[in-house]
Amino acid sequence: MVLQDLGRRINAAVNDLTRSNNLDEKQAFDDMIKEICAALLSADVNVRLVQSLRKSIKSSVNFASLPPAVNKKRLIQKAVFDELVSLVDPHAEPFRPKKGRSNVIMFVGLQGAGKTTTCTKLARHYQMRGFKTALVCADTFRAGAFDQLKQNATKAKIPYYGSLTQTDPAIVAAEGVAKFKKERFEIIIVDTSGRHKQEEELFTEMTQIQTAVTPDQTILVLDSTIGQAAEAQSSAFKATADFGAIIITKTDGHAAGGGAISAVAATHTPIIYLGTGEHLMDLERFEPKAFIQKLLGMGDMAGLVEHVQAVTKDSASAKETYKHISEGIYTLRDFRENITSIMKMGPLSKLSGMIPGLSNLTAGLDDEDGSMKLRRMIYIFDSMTAAELDGDGKMFVEQPSRMVRIACGSGTTVREVEDLLSQHRMMAGMAKRVGGQKKQMQRAQNMLKGGNKEQQLAAMQKRMAAMGGAGGGGFPGMPGMGDMAKMMQMLQGQGGGGGGGLPGLGGMDLQSMMSQMSGLMGGGGGGGGRGRGR
């Protein structure tokens, strides 16, 4: 992952400071800033930006003027976080397409940056959100450009327009946009040829296309591997095409990536999406605070919820699974649905970055091995009968020969079948707890409907204290419910089901679920197998 090493180094610098027992203000603070600046420079972030960030952090923490009661370590952490956010946030609002009218989006960028693939990714992204989308290939310079766009668009089931005979890209773009406007398409994305700041003819061609289609938004596609050249190239494109947004591609690689971030400061233009892989679904919405949180290992739960909602949208089976879990039931079919949802969400490394604390747990896992193990689990499910899938797994205990039959039918081993069933038992136990908690919350809601709520809440708090439940640690199995104000929100139906749950995954505690899943994908599984194999 791009900038992963940068995140580790910055995190280590801040953690070293916060772990020290005595804060030697000057020495510890200067050492931390020095390490952060060295990490940013090694990640190809522009030198002037690093110097500016250094001054900003120093000026925002004035030890002499702080009251004695202030937690200086927390203040330093916040200063570092805020300055890193400002590094990637130009405070410019990007264009937002409107439904019911044609929104023309034009892509520009260097050759090989991934424009054509990103065009299809963005079209698919908007298509999944209810927009009527289309693609126009105005790249008449590169051999095979139209064929590539045609192949991608066909795969994503998106209408496209291009020409194998017309060589003037401005004419092709104008014809394509006019055609799709007439057919009332809401998002029309125009792909153009890759160009370099030294190629004046291609830059002139770009302005001609822009004049022909009058786009509502022009997007610069920037390769994360470009390094220090990013600032000069993006400035040249800004002067000619005046783009209003940036998409950074190839962020799943191991390049430094800081150069692309420098382009934000150089052009005062917001990053709107990150390309996180070669597949059409590998496009993440960029949000500065969430990006820095992930960079520092703090997770991005809001992004995860949005991702899960997009994947499980309108899924009848996901709704059925949620209903089962809310009742404390978890069948093998429900488990299969959860595995399918996780596979749709992308590689485990991508998901783990969104969950606080889980990125370290999955650091050594190979995504390809992990996805293969998930596929083998699906093979096992597909070899089960309807009665086995809709059961609770007890029939396998009563008739172990069923495991042998399933292993033979799925091309797996008996040990793998045993591991899957063991994992299901753990998940079923979690579902049972979620169902029990929901019933308790319903009883508490009913109890609070009449009478003095404050008195009833105080009485409940006393009972919890007597049971050892009120110490700020929250209820068992319900993360983040430490204070009573949050409890009131949940009692009134505002907190969602289960505190740590997510739609499409049945409201279960996803962090626990993913931790167990990563264990299984890492080879150990849930344990509990008797070691037999075939």
From Swiss-Prot:
Family matches, as SMART domains: AAA (SM00382), SRP54 (SM00962), SRP54_N (SM00963)
Catalytic activity line of the entry: GTP + H2O = GDP + phosphate + H(+)
EC number in record: 3.6.5.4
Positions of region (M-domain): 297-534
Top-level EC class as recorded in UniProt: hydrolase
UniProt keyword annotation of Nucleotide-binding present: yes
Signal peptide extent: none
Self-association state and partner proteins as the record states: Fungal signal recognition particle consists of a 7S RNA molecule (scR1) and at least six protein subunits: srp72, srp68, srpA/srp54, sec65, srp21 and srp14.
Cited function: Signal-recognition-particle (SRP) assembly has a crucial role in targeting secretory proteins to the rough endoplasmic reticulum (ER) membrane. SRP is required for the cotranslational protein translocation for ER import and preferentially recognizes strongly hydrophobic signal sequences. It is involved in targeting the nascent chain-ribosome (RNC) complex to the ER and is proposed to participate in the arrest of nascent chain elongation during membrane targeting. srpA/srp54 binds to the signal sequence of presecretory protein when they emerge from the ribosomes.
HAMAP family: SRP54
Identification of the protein by name: Signal recognition particle subunit SRP54
Organism: Aspergillus niger
Name of encoding gene: srpA
